[in-house]
């Protein structure tokens, strides 16, 4: 017998800064569904997850709690593992970056990269965001705050070791271009290429001296290894990679990884930083990195003060494990963010699980017991409608496989539930209760119930990857296809008002003083204009190809802006917010048909669009996605 093909799947490791909410939990459930499905196809699956446990943020949180960082991460890692287990995830390895073998291997990897000239010592000066553990230049900040999370940043300067990213950039670009499946979805690949790789990579800071909670650089112990060479190496250390000798059999068997599942917010680290580290180590790159969308709270951002944070264990208490698994897997689009709320959970449970699935199984098992004492055989009394049910049943596994190969897990689940819906329609078409009234149609009735049991069983077997407990319960009720058990309710319908009342008892809203929202500004309204007035203005995307300060002015910059095939000179009062050097290369939004005028004696042929906050800070309006110079703004 030939060996089973291997399949190595990983999630990002969870940061141990606090209890994960349902949005954090989605990723592990998604990975589990894929891992289970691959096992059902005969793959030898190795599924790794774990926790990221070092960093300044954890050091500060431990200090606030009055405990050591290790005590702090032990508590949080234990809670994360408890929730992963609660969600019935079938991981094979749970790695912690505080594990001794991981820390030792990270030190060896750091030394190897240093010895071969990929890492060097220097100084880092910039703005630092503690929650994101990232440095930024002034020009990268958004309104003076972290461009990733929007929180305040602090100036920082420290000695650090750097990795020569540019040394491998061209090689990575070539790899991505020749391996279109490497970064998925395609929109994430385009983002990485256009926003990071093609503009050029800066060398990456890979050590810190301003905090101690990390893996020491053994040949320079005042430094600790920064997150990039720590957390991002777990995917190889967890399966026994050794950079200075023979790696373990588990690594040799499973590397390169077949699939890395990570959130879209950290795809840059996993598709640029980590592949370059692997190239430097002489290792092949993973076959695919999938940046999944986010699961968002239905009524806005999750906030403890509003009492609207959704945690997996609390959802499980209300709905059960498989109902929660079903929702997060079924409601997440392939690329766009999904939404979750108590109301949506109740609606989906009642509609899909209690009605479509639960009612189908209950009716089928009940009728089999009522009319045949729980035992049926195929009497072969067929009608045309049977052929369609059989065709749908046989085609569903093919459709599911196609969707799973594309990582369209929600669509795969839809195909399974389409089969269950077809079974319900089959009941309406064949009307077993009417057949039961005619003794001459007894064999036809038994054939109908036999067909139903076979089709539902086929769907239940497919459902195992997504809802393992429910699959097991259905197959147990349906027995071996001949003898069924007594019917049991799979999912109870819920009343939304009762659920919300219990939720309010569990999480009463916290009264807090109303504070001015710094992200909202009210300005005095101007008189309304007509569509005709607005239509007179022409807005286009422009690219700044040159910029210089306007002499004898403290406020003005003069930019040469390429708009389509023409270049316009535009003078703007933004000198206090941008340097001339920063402006060059920016894509901006331009009012192009503004009547030319002179500012400080310099001709200006248009206007750059900016936003201004309450403190007078300006930010240029730029396209959200790459757009060509000259593109119309409409």
Task: Indicate residue ranges for each PLM-predicted region.
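A glycine-rich helix N-cap at a beta->alpha junction
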Residues: 78-92
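Secondary-structure transition/capping motifs at alpha-helix termini
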Residues: 1-3, 37-44, 65, 69, ...
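Structured secondary-structure scaffolds
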Residues: 2-49, 101-105, 155-370, 414-416
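Intrinsic disorder at enzyme termini
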Residues: 471-533
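N-terminal catalytic cores of NTP/NDP-binding nucleotidyl/phosphoryl-transfer enzymes
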Residues: 2-76, 95-111, 115, 132, ...
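Cys/His-rich short segments
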Residues: 116-169, 173
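Phosphate-backbone binding interfaces of nucleic-acid-interacting proteins
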Residues: 512-634
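Helix-rich, typically C-terminal accessory recognition domains appended to large enzymatic cores
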Residues: 121, 344-381, 392-491, 591
